Amino acid sequence: MDLIWLIPLLPGLGAAVNGLLGIRYFSKPVAAGIACAAMGGSLLLSLFAFAQLLGAEHREHIVTIANWIPPIPLETVSGVGQFEVPWAFRLDPLSGMMILIVTGIGFLIHLYSSSYMDHEPRGGYVRFFTYLNLFCFFMLMLVLGSSFLVMFVGWEGVGLCSYLLIGFWYHKKSAADAGKKAFIVNRIGDFGFVLGVFLVFFTFGTLDFREVAEAAAHMPVEAGGFGVISLICLLLFVGATGKSAQIPLYVWLPDAMEGPTPVSALIHAATMVTAGVYMVARNAVLFEHAPNVMFIVAVVGAVTALVAATIGLVQTDIKKVLAYSTVSQLGYMFLATGVGAFSAAAFHLMTHAFFKALLFLGSGSVIHAMNDEQDMQKMGNMRRYMPVTFITMFVGSIAIAGIPPFSGFFSKDEILAYTFQENKVLWGLAVITAGMTAFYMFRLIFMTFFGEYRGPSWEKADDSHGDHGHDDNHGHAWHGPHESPRLMTTPLWVLAVGAIVAGFVGIPAAIGDFIGVGNAIHHFLEPSFTAGLAGHGDEHAGLHLSHAVEWALMAFSVLVAACGIGLAYVNYVRRPERAAQWKTNWAGAHRVLTNKYYVDELYDATAVKGTMASGRGLWTFDKGVVDGAVNGAGWLTRAAAWVSHVLDKYIVDGLVNLVGWIFAEGSYVFRRGQTGLIQNYAVATLFGVFVFVTVYVVARYVG
Amino acid sequence: MSNTAEFPLLSLIMFTPLVGAVLLLFVSKHSENTIRWIANGFAVLGFLVSLPLWFWLDQSTSDWQFVERLSWIPSIGAEYFIGVDGFSALLILLATLMGSIAILSSWTAITERVKEYYIFLLLLQTGMIGAFVSLDFLLFFVFWEVMLVPMYFLIGIWGSTNRLYSAIKFFLFTLVGSVIMLLGILAVYFYHHEVTGVYTFDITRFHELNMPFDLQWWVFLAFFLGFAVKVPMFPFHTWLPDAHTDAPTAGSVILAAVLLKMGTYGFIRFSLPILPEATQAFVPWVVWLSIIGIIYGALVAMAQRDWKRLVAYSSVSHMGMVMLGMFALTPVGITGSIVQQINHGISTGGLFLLVGVVYERRHTREISEYGGLSKIMPAYAAVFLVMTMSSIGLPTLNGFIGEILILQGIFVVNKVWAAFAATGIVLGAAYMLWLYQRTMFGTVNNPKNEGLADLSLREFATFTPLLILAVWIGLYPKPFIDRLDTSVDRVMARVNSTYAPLNAGAADEDEAEPGGGDLLAQIDGETTGDGFDRLVRLPVRGGSR
């Protein structure tokens, strides 16, 4: 277990090698081999660590490998503390489960991608695996980080990889836009998250999860009011809504489907988008102390689940259906955390990782077969061409719809039971959502795999379409829908098995007591949610429903799911014309739903346009006013200089010149006398003598 | 280690570029490659001789290190008094590194009046280093002014379209600020004489001065004008986008990476410790100007169509962050502020270099002229991506460390300020990613871009140190932060009389007089010594008095 830091490091090294050398030098198989080997090694290490964890008495292990931010003194609420963050990793049941999900599904998706991305040119192919490895590195950091800040490293890092992978086909504007949107919307969430982290430090003087939980455990539960823990939790939850695509920050996830499908499966279904749920579960003790925020979390989760499901009902892009389904299922997980069922949330996170990764990879297989067509209206009857994809996707759909004994049933049922216990209204929303889920998933199955084939015929379809895809680089002609190669179907099989059996670790008490099996995952995970809660037993947030109620709830949710499936069957297989009828009868509602409630338009008109306009406005202000003042000062100086110049030239200098002029002009008179003629001078001399003599005589004899 | 100070290391670092510049005077202006080799050689040499600052710096002492002290103008008490602490040592290393990079980046970009160009760049190096090492306020001021001249010519001669306007604007702005700052310096100088009867510009003595609040207030304002123009803080920033846009690439790099740090350096070295009470009084004003700078700079950056001007406005935003951390007046905030000064040098310097690369190829900075460069210049796009991420503070890269420390540092002081400032992380991502998308992503629509060459080996060499530093500081900032401990303690001890540093167990706990600190009084013991004992760096605080 001391080597858990190698778990993230291996894919990190893979990314470094492929990124620094591979993009330039490696062939496709070498690059894919390195990437897969890195993930395989990481998976083995994870299994090993997990086995050790199971065997250990004390199921918590922290490994500190280095100092990151050395201690610096800083005031906190309770005096001067030390701001210090080590590179520390923490393995406990929750993170143990997560590393298995990330490395396991990550490994499968690496394998799948090595075939799926084969059409890419070599450079792009290697670049893809670099990003994918880098993503796993950051995701494992996120999961294993033992403090808020180390988690935040992974948190932001997966955001970067998401950005890069969504925009993988960056020459498409829509892809580049979607990547940017994902990053910026996530940053809005991070804004809340970092403030939450700052407040955590200010309140507790540490950022370590365990220390925070221990400190929080000794603080009163903020039942009546909205204290500092509530504020922390609310801010953290803002971060979670960004990363896990909840209202109001869910808008980036459907757009993220611009990325290659394996990316959608790994990042935007199985792992990264669950980070918010993971983070909330990681801080279970904190959230337990903020019941008001818990309620907000539950409401946001339930409403998001419902809203996303309604949008999912009408989407025709196969990946968009799955995207909204993901948003909706994440809503379920938040609903679970909100009602205090943290292990149910983690359980659903795990089963969802299996069946949603499966569904995405299956859809990728279909898209691949259809030469990059994603519109279900142009598919149909695909089960004839690709039986493996059909069977495995069918399994996934049953699992997500919540039909026993597939995995989704157990996890979703647990959430529903807890919700029922806490709040009947939210339970109602969740059940309606469950029905919709079953409907839109089977609508997807029926539209894709049943009915008439509606796609282009392949005799003449060599290159006539592709407005949806990345087929500029396809070197080969399309020969009609076909089953995918083994490298792609094998992961489907593995995940399908997982989607069937993963639920057995969380058999509810009503059934478990009946057949003599306990709820393994609940007991396994519980210590992670009560860490630091001294004296509190396992049952701090147990289910107190009678078996009869539990049975009834289960039966009801299965019934609702069955109704959803039946409705889909009737509308899309038995009488497909009815679907069109619905569309015309409810045109208004349909338009609102296909336009996703116009939320994107709203955000665009307010936040995006507002920011851009204020940017432009301020720039004008900068040029006109701020710089205008500077230039104005410059102009004034010059004007003053000009005035001085004028004054100088005409007044000051004028005076000088005037004096000069006077002398010049005055001297004119005298100049006239300077004739240069001796006789004139002689006359003048005589005249002068005469004057002097006269004056002398007069003065002498008169005076 | 302790014998290193007997060797005039700092003078060597400072004058190496100057020697290069003088040598260039004797080279014929027609042998341009010889000139380039000499300039590059001396720049790299300058960096190499500055490396001992990293390795030999004693992190355990709050004394000034590598001190040299000679008489300069005895009649007014001015001395050639130089020395460093961790803070200035790091900035000197930044200056010598970025100087070498800037000079290397000019190899093919500058083809006219090559000789004068390199002479000015090398002179600028000496000026910058001189300002960072000066412990005499007059000496500092001289270097501060000396820096102006080469930069003025670099912009005015080798700049682009509006170069004269920009050069004069840069010059006048800084000059006005520094003239007023000089008044402030003189006020401190005469006050010191009035109190002690000694005429001196010795900064270490000024650090112990307890000036009356009114005087502090006015002097703070005077210093503020000088330094805030240089940072630049809103609303004194408008010279910056013009200067950056019109300066040659190397000029922009130096300007962003080092010259702007003169302002923040000035605040931390002079305003805060000399004027602690006034500093505290001005905190809300400076903080709000910083916050306005952060948001305003980011929003205006978003509206830019000129690539370089966008980076320039992002600089305004980032420097607002630096100022904010500083005026948190918490150790974490000030540490973050200093770390972020270095980070800003790396990432913004890198971004200007990157603009320079494509500008040299296309001679346009219009963002709309580009697009799809990822396909043509993949290595360039990769470097640009790392620099972008560093600039927007992605964890594992350097910018994150600075931002998180600054925001955490300000958060414990005032949560509202922190919340406003943190919007910068959203806006920063928005304008940088949009820039990235417009230049790197999409298809190559402009035929002029089709044949662009990717990074050459020389260009790649200019980026390599920056990339390494970005990752290093991001993953393991400890060596940097450790070197700053005592510098931060020194400032904190002045601005917060109850502050007790972590690593000084024996430090004074007792209440100091307003603005005073016994810790500093101890340092005083040395600085008032007869000068020559300062030539030898004393690792132990000796009673040399």
Protein language model annotation of sequence segments:
Chain B
Residues 21-32, 99-111, 153-162, 231-245, ...:
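C-terminal ends of transmembrane helices
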